[in-house]
Regions:
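Extreme N-terminal tail/first-helix region
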Residues: 1-14
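Alpha-helical membrane-embedding segments
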Residues: 6, 104-105, 144
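Short, contiguous alpha-helical
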Residues: 11-15, 19-22, 30-72, 111-155
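Acidic/histidine-rich alpha-helical segments that form the ligand environment
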Residues: 76-109, 114-137
Length: 155
């Protein structure tokens, strides 16, 4: 049976999602990235921290990274630092992706076991969901968010 989603296509999709989320981070004014929330939801920076923590956990579990992207309680406090950390995570992803090997191999994260490919799909859905919250915050601030369909690989 032919693969429905190749590792290369999965990486392209993940990187498209991450690039779009980066544009949303960039669209926020500095202060609002860390402070604005609606209906007691987290500020967008806290959602970005979640994306990076999950990615960091993946790096440690699957890629055997010997470091963490940031220490507990030490998430960046400026947009410039957040974007630099985001880019560092992307560099690690690019460097380590070819080392994954078997994308069907099970991986347990947060007491849930899925294949590596399923975890990447989970990350994509989780990030897309929370990015939608970021879009709502931007619109509430009177800022037009990036087009949700504007993926780099579509060019």
């Amino acid at each position: 049976m032919k693969e429905l989603l190749t590792p290369e296509a999965l990486l392209t999709n993940l990187k498209d999602v991450r690039a779009l989320t980066r544009k949303v981070i960039e669209a926020f004014p500095e202060k609002d990235l860390f402070e604005v929330n609606i209906a007691n939801l987290r500020p967008f920076s806290a959602m970005v921290e979640e994306f990076l923590r999950v990615m960091d956990y993946l790096f440690k579990e699957r890629f055997q990274e010997q470091h963490t992207l940031f220490l507990e309680g030490a998430f960046p406090t400026t947009k410039t630092e957040v974007l630099a950390l985001w880019d560092r995570a992307t560099e690690i992803l690019d460097r380590e992706w070819t080392k994954v090997g078997d994308y069907t191999q099970p991986l347990t994260i947060y007491q849930m076991t899925f294949s590596f490919a399923q975890w990447i799909l989970y990350f994509i859905e989780n990030e897309s969901h929370h990015r939608g919250q970021g879009y709502t915050y931007l619109r509430a601030l009177g800022i037009e968010p990036p087009f949700f369909w504007a993926r780099e690989s579509f060019n």
